[in-house]
Amino acid sequence: MFPQNNLPGLLLLLLIAPTTPGAASGAAAAEPADLWRREHRLIDLHQHVGCTTQHLARAVRIMDAVGLGLVVNLSGGFVTPARDGGPSEFERNQTLADTLHPGRFLHYLSLDYSGWDDPGFSERAVQQIETGHRLGAAGLKEYKRLGLFLRDKAGNLIRPDDPKLDPVWKRCGELGLPVSIHVADPKAFWLPYNERNERWKELKDHQSWWFGDTNKFPPWKDLLESLNRVIERHPKTTFVCVHFANNAEELEWVDAALDRHPNMMADLAARIPEIGRHDPRQVERLFLKHQDRILFGTDFQVYHRLILGSSGNEPPPTDADAELFFAKHWRWLETRDRDWEHMTPIQGDWTISSIGLPPSVLRKIYFDNARKLLVRSLPPPTLRARRISQDLPLGQPVRNNLWELAEPVRIEQRAADGEVNPALTTSVRALWSERYLYLALEAPFTRLTVFEPAQANAERVALDRPGASLWDRDVVEAFIGSETGAPGRYIELEVAPTNERLDVRVDLPRKDFAWSSGFESTSLVDRKHKVWSCQMRVPLQSLAANPPRPGAVWRLNLFRCDRANRAFLAWRPTLSGSFHEPARFGWLEFLP
C-alpha cells in the first residue's frame, strides 16, 4: 500500500509558490492535483533507475514523497542472453524490481546492435522485440546513439531511418509496443564550444555532448528529419518523441509535427527549462491543442547519484533536492507564476513562466494519456477491502460512514481500448465482514437508460431475444473469482439503477443463470446531482467454499454500461469486445 499522505511534497509546493495573483490563479488546478498525488496516481513515463536493491529503494522512497504511483524505467536493458547463458539484463532488472516493489515500475527494452553488419541483423532485431514483448517489456527505448554515436564497420553513422531498422519499428506497432525515441539534442550543442555558449555549464562537464564538429556529426535538423521519415513510414507504430519532440526550442515545429503525425506523442522530460522560456500563452495554447498527445516525464535518474534532468560536477543532490525538482514541475504546470528559477539550473541561466493548465488537461498529461498508451502493460490494479467488525445495513451514505475508511478505485476506462472517460468516472469501495463482502459504487450520469417497469420477482435474462436482458441497459457489474487456479471460474453480479439485479455463476464457456448467490443490493438515483449510487452485500459463502482470511487475494474486475453515452467502461480494460476476459482481471485484497 502507498502512504496515506503526501505532506513533504505538498509543503514544498507551498514553500516555493509566491503569494501573488498568478499563484492564486493556480489554486483550482492544485486542489485536484494534490488529491492525485496523495493517491499516487501520477505516472512518470521517462526515468532511468539502476536496478539494484539500494537504487530501487531510493527511487520508491522519492516516488512516495512526491506522489508518483508508477515509473517507466527506460533503462530496462537488453533482452539478449547474458554471456554466461543466464538471464538477460532485462530479465534480471525486471525480476528484481517486481520482487522488491511490485506494481511500481514498468521497463522498456533496448536494442542490441551487435552484428549490425552481419547478414540477418533485421531478423535478429525483430526477434529481440518479440522476446521483449514476451518478457513483459512495456516498450522500446532508443537513445540518441542513432545518428550521433552508432557506426557500422566502415565508420558510417547509423541513422534512425536506416531501412534495416524498418522491420523493428513495424513489429513494435504490430505488438502494441510504443517507441520512446531520442534524436539530436538542444541546438546549442551544435554551436561553438566555448564559454559564450548558453549551455556551457553543461557542455564543459560533458564534452561528448558537443556535436559541432561537422566532420563527425550531421547537422541538427537532419536528425529530426530522419526521425520524421521513420514516423511517416510506420503510421501504426506510436512514437513518443522524448524531450518534447526532441525540439523544445521550436514550438511551431512541434505543433506542425504533431498535426502531421497522428502516431507521434511528446514527453516533457528534461525540457521544461526550454519550453518554459517561451511565451507562456503560446505554450498553453499548444498544450491545450495537443492535450491528448503530451506525456509527463522528467528524465529523473537514480544511480550512484541522483540526476535531476541533467547534471555536471556539482555536489550530489539529496532526496530533498529531488522533492523540490518535482515540486517545480507541479508549479510550472499548475500555476501561472512568472519569471522564476527552473528545476535544472545547469540547463541554462534564465527564468521560466508557468502555464496553469486546467484539471481536465492536467490529468491527461499526468496519467490518463500514459494509461491509454501503456494499457497492455500496466500492472493489475488492486481493490482493498477494509475489514469491519459488524455487519452494515445497506443504503447508508458513503460519506461520514465506515465506507469512508475504504480507499476507492475507479471505473473510467473504455473496456475495449483503455480510452479514459472522466465524465463517467465511477468510484468503487469495498468492505468485508465475517459473513459478507460489501461494494459501494457511485456513478455520475447524463441520462439513465433502464427497463420500465422494473422487474421485481425474477431476473431479466432473455438469451433468445437480443436487447432484452438486464445488461442491455445501464448496469454496474462485478466479476469476482476466488479460485486463483481456475481463472475461468467466477461470479458475475449486476445491478441496474432500478435495483434490478442479476447473478451468474460462470465457468467459461458455461454460464449458470439459474444459480443464486443470495446477494442484496440498494440503488439510489439522485437526479438533482446526476449521480446514481449502488451498494451490494454478497454472502462470502456464495463466493468461495472457504471464507477468505485476512490478507487473502482474489481476482476481480468491475464494469459499467452507460447506454446514453455508448460507454462500456472497465476498471481494468479487457482490450476486447467482451467483459469476460479473466486474464485481464485485477485483484481484490482482504485487509486485516
Regions of interest found by a model, annotated:
Residues 8-22:
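Bacterial N-terminal signal peptides
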Residues 47-56, 77-90, 114-123, 150, ...:
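Acidic-and-aromatic substrate-binding clefts and catalytic sites of carbohydrate-active enzymes
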Residues 53, 215, 221-229, 238-378:
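H/E-rich (His + Asp/Glu) clusters that bind or coordinate divalent metals
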Residues 25-103, 381:
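An N-terminally biased module of ancient metal coordination in phosphate/nucleic-acid-related enzymes
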Residues 31, 54-59, 82-96, 123-128, ...:
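Alpha-helical scaffolding within the catalytic cores
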Residues 30-33, 87-211, 215, 262-265, ...:
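Active-site gating/metal-coordination segments in enzymes
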Residues 379-592:
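Structural preference for beta-rich elements and adjacent junctions enriched in aromatics
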Residues 43-47, 70-74, 105-109, 140-142, ...:
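Hydrophobic faces of well-ordered beta-strands that scaffold small-molecule active sites
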